[in-house]
Amino acid sequence: MMKVRPVERRDLADIFELAGKTGVGMTSLPQNEQHLAARIERALNTWQGSLDPGEQGYLFVLEDSEQQKVVGVSAIEVAVGLNDPWYNFRVGTLVHASKALNVYKSVPTLFLSNDHTGYSELCTLFLDPDYRKDKNGPFLSKVRFLFIAAFRQYFSRKVIAEMRGYTDEQGRSPFWESVGRHFFSIEFAKADYLSGTGQKAFIAELMPKHPLYVDFLAEEARAVIGQVHPHTTPARAVLETEGLQYQGYVDIFDGGPTLEANTDDVRAVRDSSKRTVVIKDYDIEDYDIDPNGRLYLVANDHYHHFRAILMNTHLSDERLRLTPESAEALGVAAGDSVRIVSLFAPETKR
């Protein structure tokens, strides 16, 4: 069975192995054992309540319980930019006009921005390529919304997600070559690694503070502004079906889009509800425990021992019927409450 739970120290080796499969461009999961160990400790301290909001970050793992192996990760940063500045580019417009010359021209422009300071961020989503099936990807991504819904008081009024921008098969970023390289004089992979390991001072020191005219960039750089890496297209689609949208902000390194939404308007947060657990073995006549039913995300309401699974079921009342195996995976007993939401919006066909 596949289940999502909070990260533990024993997961370090598996996460380090996963980090080696990400490739260039995923700044939040570098293959650096010391950094990953510190990331795990920060998550544990977040759950223990010993950090300020600007330092808090939750890290979840997807575990294959049969193999006893972590095969995916996803995370939530509680409030970005409160300790280290949070940078991106806002794609805006400057107008140049002259009545005397009868000239009026609007020019697309990149403005360095800290507009998302204080927002909660969905980040560090990565699934082992061998497990990109059976709806594991949407499960690992959307389970964070159930956690946010259950513990809404810990999160901002807005949620954002920086999507990995376009790089070619050699890890080359056209956007970086046309923008970042001129100011940093280092390779994209190096800047990507430094940022991912928390060494971000160079961004503030070297990034241009004045607007950049998009028309001055190379054509291939202009073409990838707001575009995602091909491997990130499914992750973007998952978030967009939940209500997150691109509002004209892009990553300063690779030009990838930032998606955002009001937290309470996210479909899985808004539509999630509680059910009371009933435990019974599967019966062919049982309409509720049905392998052909709609797919649902189901999670317990235990903050420190959060668990979530995917299950097929039909909802007929305020109760949720679980098999003993599902109840054990969730860590719940009969009479406990669980939070549930359909994996996909009712109008979305999967």
UniProtKB/Swiss-Prot annotation:
Q: In which pathway does it act?
A: Amino-acid degradation; L-arginine degradation via AST pathway; L-glutamate and succinate from L-arginine: step 1/5
S-adenosyl-L-methionine keyword on record:
no
Q: Where does succinyl-CoA bind?
A: L125
Coiled-coil spans in chain = none
What does UniProt list as catalytic? H229 (proton donor)
Output one GO MF annotation.
Answer: arginine N-succinyltransferase activity
Q: What class of enzyme is it?
A: transferase
Give the Pfam families listed for this entry.
AstA
The enzyme's E.C. designation: 2.3.1.109
Q: Which reaction does it catalyse?
A: succinyl-CoA + L-arginine = N(2)-succinyl-L-arginine + CoA + H(+)
Which UniProt keywords are listed? Acyltransferase, Arginine metabolism, Transferase
Please cite one Gene Ontology biological process associated with this protein: arginine catabolic process to glutamate
Q: Which family does it belong to?
A: Belongs to the arginine N-succinyltransferase family.
Q: What does this protein do?
A: Catalyzes the transfer of succinyl-CoA to arginine to produce N(2)-succinylarginine.
User: Do you know which HAMAP family this protein is assigned to?
Assistant: AstA (MF_01171)
The protein's name: Arginine N-succinyltransferase
Q: Which organism is it from?
A: Yersinia pseudotuberculosis serotype O:3 (strain YPIII)
Gene name of this polypeptide: astA
